[in-house]
Curated annotation (Swiss-Prot):
The keyword Ribosomal protein applies. It is found in: Plastid, Chloroplast. This is Small ribosomal subunit protein uS8c. The gene is rps8. It comes from Spirogyra maxima (Green alga). One of the primary rRNA binding proteins, it binds directly to 16S rRNA central domain where it helps coordinate assembly of the platform of the 30S subunit. It comes from the Eukaryota. HAMAP family: Ribosomal_uS8_B. One of its GO terms (molecular function) is structural constituent of ribosome.
Length: 132
């Protein structure tokens, strides 16, 4: 494992989606918890639980592959800002994913949030990833 926890999280979710696995374990940190809560609120995952195993806190994400009640199916997760190349944007230049169907997750001075919320609050920040 590398030191980039966000990339590890995105890769784990992407691999679980490709193998049609129902659940995926991710190391629980403040950042991964915030991103997972956003994915849950936006309807890209079904469930989120925290558990402890061998002294490590883990997040158990429940994925879904069928549309239920206007929920979204995660087809693409892409890490944008990386430790070697940070990508920042002001609130006017935050990109739209699939014309607004997907979301952009940003790290701002007010915490981690989605693109719509950042535009509304007129806050820019570091673009963490695209989800569609």
């Amino acid at each position: 494992m590398s030191n980039d926890i966000i990339s590890n999280m995105i890769t784990s979710i992407r691999n679980a989606i490709l193998s049609k696995t129902k659940t995926v374990d991710i190391l629980a940190t403040t950042t991964t918890r915030s991103i997972a809560k956003i994915l849950l609120q936006e309807g890209f995952i079904d469930g989120l639980r925290e558990r402890q195993e061998n002294g490590r806190r883990l997040l158990l994400l429940t994925l879904h592959y069928e549309r239920k009640n206007k929920s979204k199916i995660t087809t693409s997760l892409r890490r944008i800002s990386k430790p070697g190349l940070r990508v920042y944007s002001n609130h006017q230049e935050i990109p739209k994913v699939l014309g607004g169907i997907g979301i952009v997750i940003l790290s701002t001075s007010k915490g981690i949030m989605v693109d719509r919320e950042a535009r509304h609050k007129k806050i820019g920040g570091e673009i963490i990833c695209y989800v569609s």
